[in-house]
Amino acid sequence: MINTNQPVAYPIFTFRWLTIHALAVPTVFFLGAITSMQFIQR
């Protein structure tokens, strides 16, 4: 049982990072697109 250091803290951190970015990136993109559209229409 020497392989107890790596598979404990690695997947959780990666999953959390992926979840946050998967939710944040499209949201920011969508908000920016809507804002620019409203500014152009006005």
Curated annotation (Swiss-Prot):
One of its GO terms (cellular component) is chloroplast thylakoid membrane. GO terms for biological process: photosynthetic electron transport chain. HAMAP family: PSII_PsbF. Pfam families: Cytochrom_B559. Its main location: plastid. PROSITE patterns: CYTOCHROME_B559. One of its GO terms (molecular function) is iron ion binding. Its cofactor is heme b. This b-type cytochrome is tightly associated with the reaction center of photosystem II (PSII). PSII is a light-driven water:plastoquinone oxidoreductase that uses light energy to abstract electrons from H(2)O, generating O(2) and a proton gradient subsequently used for ATP formation. It consists of a core antenna complex that captures photons, and an electron transfer chain that converts photonic excitation into a charge separation. Belongs to the PsbE/PsbF family. The chain crosses the membrane at residues 17-33. This is Cytochrome b559 subunit beta. It is found in: Plastid, Chloroplast thylakoid membrane. With its partner (PsbE) binds heme. PSII binds additional chlorophylls, carotenoids and specific lipids. It comes from Emiliania huxleyi (Coccolithophore). Heme binds at residue 21.
